[in-house]
């Protein structure tokens, strides 16, 4: 009787929930929600789990920021769009919001306040100023005043973030070069800007080469920059302490010692740009290394996040914070026995370990922080865990999580004084008599900033990746299931976008659109999907020649009108389920034979890597050749890696695994990587095809495990760009199988939500996944 009653209540609630969704005209996929309810929401979660923190397995609405059911997206997008969209089979609720457009240039306008900062010994850079010559001259005046001969500026921040915030975009303020990668060497002569080859065309377009010398960093000349600096004549060189990594610093230091073996390097930290106590006497036998607490280049105003952190629920990541901390403790107990202090400085590691997410970055749900672990060898436990962050951004449930896991909270700015005044004095002196066992004071990331690194004696610092890098690189089954769900949602958004493009192409209205309006459109379609947070990076929307710029970003200056030409879309989203990244190259006209040939050669490499079988001990760099071989055979190549790791609602580019021509390491089951070969013809067009895939175990023999990949991305390739004469029957078979999987996955969801998609989208999905005929010969 009781069971029957409970069953009745459950069915009633489900029907009621469905009616609420329909009557409320929500943009969620109702049927998908029902079909995936158990898998997406309860996989790996039990009320009787051994989690120390029950709030981590609670429903979404326990988070103060109310991240469930795409409310976050609507909070952003409902105020960001400033042009009208035509009605194209949108749901009624979407139609009501058709005046909404997402503005990618300032996604956090509603959650940021502006703070004015000032400093006497700095260049005051107004965000709207556009005079690099004047700014460069002002910087040189400050350098001359303080007897600084060489000043190094690096596009980075305190945490080695790939995509940095406005407060750290100092190179663009001096040079007008806006790429994510760059190292600027300022001297009394012509400054030198080094950029990664990915940004070569962008730098050539943006940089005034009458003012600056442009140098390109490639795979075969990565250390050239250190030779360049070593060749300069100087007595004093200065670095931004918070934006310079120890890896760069130590490589340069070594290069200078080799170039000038008779010179002595004198290092000094300069606090608050107070140069009064610096020895300014020119001594030809001394090289002064100044580590600046504050940069010589100051951004006068920049956005500051005031939005609170939230708990990333265990139903999405499969493990409590306490479980992850215990796993880290095991590493210190059994694997890392020569150090008792561990400082995490990489923000995705901290967010992953604590199951927290935030809003300090535009495209990654991270927050400024450090996390210090102090291990007691006698107790075999952590004596202290100290979390440095913006305390006012911690809501009650997050504070509760931290308290349960015995995490002490301190303000973000206290990290340097705490290490200097509390941690360092408490470290016992080590007996280094045993050459086989070197005891270190602290373990730091190789990319830790100089302000932290210089607090310690370098010989007592263990520079190595933390165990968390490997922990988060290997996803658990719950994470893989959620990543699949994120990519299904992503595939539906791409389907709507490319269907919209095709409808507009037929009426030629598409050719009144621009790269930027198409970027806004695809970002908008993603925003309608359940549990979407924001884009995972700045969407690359590139038409014609702009598609040849690998990391192209359309601006008001470069924004091109859409032409009947090749169009490359590289985009992704952050969902509570996971992070996505996908690239599709299409053509809005009739492709040439050359365009078809190159697209097909790129696709052949992509397909080979997609289903390759390899032994578990294989270095991932060996897989890179597989994606390039067809291009190599035609004397072609691409100047970027083939695959990068991807986080789960973390960074879209994640460490711990990669596929590239150099470096690499063996891959493990459940690692998630991209597969993205390409080819780029300057001033003509570019092609890139990118899927997300995860490592699967294919076979285990007596001696070896054999691995392969399975797809996460759920969107078909462009059949219009195929040169069928270059494809084998096996490749065509694989294409058909993949497209059938996409159809079988997305079509039921499209049919179940006619208000959101409609018959036209359904027909379009069937059309683009139609099987390709197998060759007769």
Curated annotation (Swiss-Prot):
Entry function: Catalyzes the removal of a penultimate prolyl residue from the N-termini of peptides. In the food vacuole, involved in the final step of host hemoglobin catabolism, by cleaving hemoglobin-derived oligopeptides. In the cytoplasm, may be involved in the last steps of the turnover of ubiquitinated proteins.
Keyword annotations from UniProtKB, A to Z: Aminopeptidase, Cytoplasm, Hydrolase, Manganese, Metal-binding, Protease, Signal, Vacuole
Disulfide bonds: none
Family: Belongs to the peptidase M24B family.
Post-translational modification remark: The N-terminus may be proteolytically cleaved to generate a 73-kDa mature form.
Protein name: Aminopeptidase P
A GO-annotated cellular component: cytoplasm
Molecular functions per Gene Ontology: manganese ion binding; metalloaminopeptidase activity
